[in-house]
Structure formats: structure tokens, C-alpha cells
Design a protein with these regions (language model features):
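A short beta-strand micro-motif common to beta-rich folds, especially ectodomain repeats
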Residues: 80-93
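Surface-exposed, short loops/turns at beta-strand junctions within beta-sandwich domains
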Residues: 69-82
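Predominantly extracytoplasmic/ectodomain segments of secreted and cell-surface proteins
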Residues: 1-30, 106-109
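Aromatic sugar-binding surface patches on proteins
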Residues: 56-72
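Solvent-exposed loop segments of extracellular immunoglobulin-like
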Residues: 31-35
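Low-complexity "stalk/linker" and mucin-like segments enriched in Ser/Thr/Pro/Ala/Gly
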Residues: 41-61
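C-terminal edge beta-strand
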Residues: 96-107
Length: 109
């Protein structure tokens, strides 16, 4: 089941979002090795970018922004925003590869 980040991203912002896998890792007595967020093609076409990303002890943190050329696009003016499905994959020391999709809304605030 996809998750959703509660706070939308304004196209003018550089903003961090995180996802935590602590419950899954604890249940399997495993530890995180890598964390990777990926952008789908529709997000890339709209100008969404990953500025940086990093792994934490139990998940990942990603910073999103919109490239300067697309920040003033009228696509962001929809009052409900534009929603993108962002995959987040981790690998563990136990050899597991886990993935979840998280919805990110981009809209003018």
C-alpha cells in the first residue's frame, strides 16, 4: 500500500522528506545497508529533481526541488497539486531488498 508525505512541496522550495523502515528491520532483526529514492519519468518531465539523498540507521532522507526553468509552470497551480509516486528501496545486511511507493504532492502554496 502506498504511503503519502503529508506536507506538499512548493516548486520554489528545497525540502527534505524521510521514510523509516524501523518496524520492518526490527521484525526481521536486520540492518539497513543502502537507501535509494527514484524519480519516475513523469516527475522528471515535470522538472522535479532529487537534490540529495542519504541513508539513516533505519531509513532514508531525500531532498527534492523543482528545476528553475519549471518553477513557474502553471502545472503547479492546480489547488489539489500534482501528485507523483516516488519509489523508495532499501537493501539490508540480510540480503533483503524492500521497496515502497510514497506519494509526493507538488503545488503552489
Amino acid at each position: 500500500m502506498p504511503l503519502a508525505w503529508a506536507a506538499p512541496l512548493d516548486p520554489q522550495e528545497l525540502k527534505d522528506y524521510s521514510n523509516d523502515w524501523a518496524a520492518e528491520l526490527t521484525a526481521t532483526s536486520d540492518t539497513l545497508v543502502t537507501s535509494t529514492f527514484r524519480l519516475p519519468s513523469d516527475a522528471i518531465a515535470a522538472g522535479l529533481e532529487i537534490d540529495s539523498q542519504s541513508a539513516t540507521a533505519t531509513g532514508g532522507v531525500v531532498f527534492f526541488d523543482v528545476n528553475v526553468a519549471d518553477q513557474d509552470s502553471t502545472d503547479w497551480d492546480d489547488p489539489t497539486g500534482t501528485i507523483f509516486r516516488i519509489p523508495h528501496q532499501i537493501t539490508t545486511t540480510g540480503g533483503r531488498r524492500l521497496e515502497v511507493s510514497i506519494f509526493l504532492t507538488v503545488m503552489q502554496k
